[in-house]
Amino acid sequence: MAFSPWQILSPVQWAKWTWSAVRGGAAGEDEAGGPEGDPEEEDSQAETKSLSFSSDSEGNFETPEAETPIRSPFKESCDPSLGLAGPGAKSQESQEADEQLVAEVVEKCSSKTCSKPSENEVPQQAIDSHSVKNFREEPEHDFSKISIVRPFSIETKDSTDISAVLGTKAAHGCVTAVSGKALPSSPPDALQDEAMTEGSMGVTLEASAEADLKAGNSCPELVPSRRSKLRKPKPVPLRKKAIGGEFSDTNAAVEGTPLPKASYHFSPEELDENTSPLLGDARFQKSPPDLKETPGTLSSDTNDSGVELGEESRSSPLKLEFDFTEDTGNIEARKALPRKLGRKLGSTLTPKIQKDGISKSAGLEQPTDPVARDGPLSQTSSKPDPSQWESPSFNPFGSHSVLQNSPPLSSEGSYHFDPDNFDESMDPFKPTTTLTSSDFCSPTGNHVNEILESPKKAKSRLITSGCKVKKHETQSLALDACSRDEGAVISQISDISNRDGHATDEEKLASTSCGQKSAGAEVKGEPEEDLEYFECSNVPVSTINHAFSSSEAGIEKETCQKMEEDGSTVLGLLESSAEKAPVSVSCGGESPLDGICLSESDKTAVLTLIREEIITKEIEANEWKKKYEETRQEVLEMRKIVAEYEKTIAQMIEDEQRTSMTSQKSFQQLTMEKEQALADLNSVERSLSDLFRRYENLKGVLEGFKKNEEALKKCAQDYLARVKQEEQRYQALKIHAEEKLDKANEEIAQVRTKAKAESAALHAGLRKEQMKVESLERALQQKNQEIEELTKICDELIAKLGKTD
């Protein structure tokens, strides 16, 4: 299979360089692709309109692009290695088998480093059309219910489970999110996982694909765009297969089928830290650290016990999580769809991040080559580890995995490009295979595609405005885990060493924040320490913003947020599948740059540059933090001042209102008094008029009284004269009366004397009569007594006589 220079790009670079082309050329691609893609394209367009793709710099940064720091081409030459978190020990036989597979895959990759651009892939169109037809024959796929960023995500619970999830949903181009909780890496178990998953890759892939198909989960197709220079990708046919029954077919298809030319399925709206545009629809895969070096670099996070982790990852049931509803971060991002479609926006970043997250998980595991141990770690954690800086395969600025060898893909594999479902860490150039073939592309191809960037650097985005700086525990990263893949990484630096470009605000801040974390870890020398990360609510963060970390914080936050929202986990998916079928199987898709080797001096130089860049970025991050704190203090002070000002203004307004109310009341009262006074005045006037009339009347009456008085005076004089005459007559009559009275009195005295004499005589006669009566009464009483006595004597005599008789 041939890779064009455009295919060997980091996710953000590819998106920045091809977004305008992809949006512009989709109309022409629709005609070539046939009528099959119309419904899915319309759905994708709707999703594109709903997703936000504006640059973070537009609203949050004012730094022009020309002033942003220039990224060194060596920054992305190595990818950070972070072992899968998982206890247990890998047997020596598994290690030897891995080393043999490393050698074989490196030999396979050596012959395919040179390639032509994918524009000439004519046979691939037929394959894509056939894939689209087969893909549309699946009725249960509901494009509207697919989560744009992580339609299929797997997580582990209790921060002790390995996030072991299949890395690619190659059969239908869906982006697989690995959002296990970050765990301390346990390389022995991780190596065992890889050895086991080599034999059972097809089984695991088919299990995840079958679960996806049952859940109606499929990837939306490419949105018809306006300025696309790239052919419209079409999804590969999806086939439901039983895990056990199709295992042998899967191995056969993976091993024997050459990698066909296929179109990439690129969806800028699914551009996510978890997905590389070079990997197609596969999420980044995480390779375990070196067995020898990981014990020293294991996180001191003792809460995540290794033994329990291994047991849970093997014994817990397989749980596939399908996100049929878009999370709030994506919804809010879609509401804020920008009008500048020429610039790609990082995927929406949900604010929640796992605290002990090392790795998003092995669910996006690389093709389980032995190179996988040395291979790429998925960019699912933003936590750099100073112990990984010595690793030749440590790429703090790479957006996905270390260089790995990839076995050929199945003939049915095709690229899928869907701007609606594009994830920043998704590689649209990474071919995806059907479920029968291995769902993993070459780790080496992934790393090559990652580090070979276009002349202009991709722009990572990290919005710092409205962000809170939180403490985040970092895991010790085994930088020497990739030491066994020395010949596959740094030789590619020569291809990108002469390329240069301006980093955007997001890229600068990404490397700043990440460099701060890495440098802090290096200086302190602690396997685990609290590092600050920017937690932005609903802020898009591109893949490169924590690119130097083997597991990017943006991806981890986003994936973990989705996983926590969906609430379903898959524990030890690769381990369980590897236990069932620990047969080594070649992974699909060969790397375009096979067998590229790097010398120790090149590795040392690259690591030195990376360290210097990390220190510089950490210093810059500290400066930004100081500026942020100063600005925050100023803002707080200004808020206080504004609050006081508002209080004062409010008090003044209230006083003014009170004064106005009082004045208004006084005015109303005075108005009422005035009206009352006017009424009183009117009544007084009426009274005065009445009084005047009465006065006039009384004047007439008074004149009449004067006339009457004169008449009465005359009468009085007459009466006085008459009184005098009558008085004289009275005196004469009085004298005459007195004389008469004297005579009468004398006569009365005489009569009284006669009467007294007569009464005395009468009294004497009466006395006599009374004496007579009294004497008669006494005699009567005596007679009565005598009669009684006689009666008694008679009665006694009669009684005596009666007794004698």
Swiss-Prot record:
Motif position, Bipartite nuclear localization signal 1: 226-241
Basic and acidic residues bias: start-end ranges: 130-140, 497-509
Motif Bipartite nuclear localization signal 2 per record, residues: 455-471
Basic residues composition-biased segments: 226-242
Residue numbers of N-acetylalanine PTMs: 2
Matches recorded under InterPro entries: TACC (IPR039915), TACC_C (IPR007707)
Coiled coil ranges: 610-805
Polar residues bias spans: 47-60, 111-128, 296-305, 377-413, 431-447
A GO biological-process term: microtubule cytoskeleton organization
Transmembrane segments: none
A GO-annotated cellular component: cytoplasm
Keywords associated with the record: Acetylation, Activator, Cell cycle, Cell division, Coiled coil, Cytoplasm, Cytoskeleton, Lipoprotein, Membrane, Myristate, Nucleus, Phosphoprotein, Repeat
Modification sites for Phosphotyrosine: 533
Top-rank taxon: Eukaryota
All residue ranges annotated as the SPAZ domain in the record: 215-297, 359-507
Processing after translation: Isoform 1 is heavily phosphorylated; isoform 6 is not.
Modification Phosphoserine, positions: 4, 10, 44, 147, 153, 228, 248, 276, 381, 406, 483, 591
Tissue: Isoform 1, isoform 3 and isoform 5 are ubiquitous. Isoform 2 is strongly expressed in the brain, weakly detectable in lung and colon, and overexpressed in gastric cancer. Isoform 4 is not detected in normal tissues, but strong expression was found in gastric cancer tissues. Down-regulated in a subset of cases of breast cancer.
Region described as Interaction with TDRD7: 152-259
Region listing for Interaction with LSM7 and SNRPG, in residue ranges: 2-55
MF GO annotations: nuclear estrogen receptor binding; nuclear glucocorticoid receptor binding; nuclear receptor binding; nuclear retinoic acid receptor binding; nuclear retinoid X receptor binding; nuclear thyroid hormone receptor binding; peroxisome proliferator activated receptor binding; transcription coactivator activity
Main location: cytoplasm
Protein name: Transforming acidic coiled-coil-containing protein 1
